[in-house]
Amino acid sequence: MNLLRRSAGKLVVMGALALTGCDNVDWGGVDIAVVPPPPRGSALEGEHAERELGPLPTGPVLYYVRTDSAGGTIVPVGEIGGDSLIPLGAGADAELYGARFISEHLRRGTEFTLFRRGTRVGTLVVQSARVPASGRCRRLPVGRGTLETSVDTLPAGVEFIALAKSTAPEGQRPSIPLTATGGMMRVAPILAERALRARSSQLPGNWSSAMAQIQPFPVSSSGDAGIASTFLVDDQLAVGNDDLGYSLFMIAVPRRDLTGYDTVYVDQSRYENGGKRAPRVIDFLDWDRDGGAELLLEVYGTSRSWYETIGPVGGTRWRRGFAESCDAAVAGAAAARDSATQDTVEGGTP
């Protein structure tokens, strides 16, 4: 009998809804809203929903900051995980993931500690954030903010590494030269020539023109300076050009007896094999707090650029710890890399 009453009640409700011809019914002081269920296979069902949303980072996130005339932009690079970075939003819907990331990590008023050359130099306070219509390799959120530094006015184009204030390391002021010394400028081409000859590669016609960047960085707490250098043939450090020529990125560190340098990392990209890959060092910071500075790179392709990181492993080896996932970066994986090469220059003054 109760079953019949419940069935009858359902028929009355269904009949009332059919007669009203709308989705909202005011019936006996109770508002009833009829919401159709999502179609099967929609983006919000089960495991597919998890893939669409993507997991948000639970650890510290590394950010890239660049100043402009109105303040600065802040872009997430990756989640710090051990001696590498974990990609953000891989396989997730960009709009859904970006909205959740902004709500959790880039809310208005969020403060970030700015680092330059391994040292704390100021703060960025987020004013707004959005998901861009297009991106480098993934459409990650971009924030805008105001910068508070010891310098009253910063020119456009100044770059920083940043972490949320609550997760930022202390940083340290390294006692290394701001720019490459004369000894570094002499040693880098010698090591580059040896690396290229070992790989049967064409040598640059002019070494001064081929040296696109040379950047000192700290390799120990004692203040010893390593060298990160980029050499280019038929190319420049910018997005564009074609898939001709090659790049050579190298890391050299002082020998223990300080009588010269050892090459500990070589990354040669022959563009005809894997597409353009022209790396430059943005800055360095010991963001994983293991006692050695990691390098944040911007790598230029023919149509876009992306981020990579290089860092020490086990004290003596160096390896690429992170590369954004995009077509250009994947194609570049075919380039010749050798982190075990030990070319040595003796007698050079570190």
Language-model-detected regions and their locations in the chain:
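Acidic/hydrophobic-patterned starts of short beta strands in beta-sheet-rich repeat architectures
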Residues: 220-232, 288-299
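Bacterial N-terminal signal peptides that target proteins for export
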Residues: 2-12
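Structural motif
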Residues: 237-251, 303-311
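Surface-exposed loop/turn elements that mediate protein-protein interactions on large endomembrane-trafficking
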Residues: 252-272, 310-318
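Bacterial signal peptide processing site
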Residues: 23-26
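Solvent-exposed N-terminal domain segments of exported/luminal and surface proteins
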Residues: 69-186
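Beta-propeller blade termini
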Residues: 212-222, 279-287, 336
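C-terminal motif of bacterial Sec signal peptides marking the signal peptidase cleavage site
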Residues: 19-21
